[in-house]
A protein has these predicted regions:
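Serine-esterase "nucleophile elbow" of acetyl-processing enzymes
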Residues: 1-72
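Structural recognition of the beta-strand scaffold that forms the well-ordered cores
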Residues: 17-22, 45-50, 74-80, 114-119, ...
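Feature marks short, surface-exposed loop/turn motifs that line or immediately flank catalytic pockets
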Residues: 28, 55, 83-86, 124, ...
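Proline-centered flexible-loop/turn and helix-kink motifs
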Residues: 42, 111-112
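Surface-exposed cleft-lining segments at the edges of enzyme active sites
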Residues: 48-51, 82-95, 125-130
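Glycine-rich anion/phosphate-binding loops
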Residues: 54-61, 91-100
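Generic structural signal for well-ordered alpha-helices
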Residues: 99-104, 139-143
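Catalytic His-Asp segment of secreted/periplasmic serine-dependent ester chemistry enzymes
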Residues: 122-172
């Protein structure tokens, strides 16, 4: 709850133009990624709503409990869902439904904000890893959620994979 309370305090300060919503990958921009965050995002009045271990229902709860109050960011970047596969082994359709609920909340609460939905990041070292397959199945459902007016979808996953579809250990 401490991180949530800090996030709500940051939101209450206002002047949030760029919002990042996600799990530990997003939270990492405030940790190991801090130098990059400071150079590229801090001056853009960015707020980081990434939480280690987060699943779609955790994000939804926080968005409904203060993390969107009183702000009108220009852009919200959303990448969430990989922990649904690992922590609870949610089926892809449930994870996709959770992402859809997050998008619906953002559309309703932030009607003037553009939303960039990123593909769920790949898991597992190899292309045939069971968790990778679950995340791939979620990602197959995400483009249909983008209306190309307010919500846009982008899959950057290939940039992180080697020629055989493997995910290098240093990225994990």
């Amino acid at each position: 709850m401490e991180r949530h309370e800090r996030a709500v305090a940051r939101i209450r300060q206002g002047h949030v133009d760029l919002l990042f919503i996600g799990d530990s990958i997003t939270q990492g921009w405030e940790e190991d990624g801090r130098p990059v965050w400071d150079i590229f995002y801090q001056h853009r009045h960015a707020a980081n709503l990434g939480y280690n271990g987060d699943q779609t229902d955790n994000v939804l709860w926080r968005l409904q409990h203060g993390e969107l109050d009183g702000i009108t960011p220009k852009l919200a970047v959303v990448m969430i869902g990989t922990n649904n596969a690992t922590r609870r082994e949610d089926p892809p359709e449930e994870t996709a439904a959770g992402i859809q609920a997050i998008l619906a909340t953002l559309r309703t609460r932030l009607p003037d904000t553009k939303i960039l939905l990123l593909a769920v990041f790949p898991r597992g070292l190899s292309a045939d890893d069971r968790l990778r397959q679950i995340n791939n199945a979620v990602n197959e459902r995400l483009p249909a959620m983008a209306d190309q007016r307010q919500v846009f979808f982008l899959n950057l996953n290939r940039r992180f994979l080697d020629n055989n579809g493997g995910l290098p250990e240093e990225i994990m």
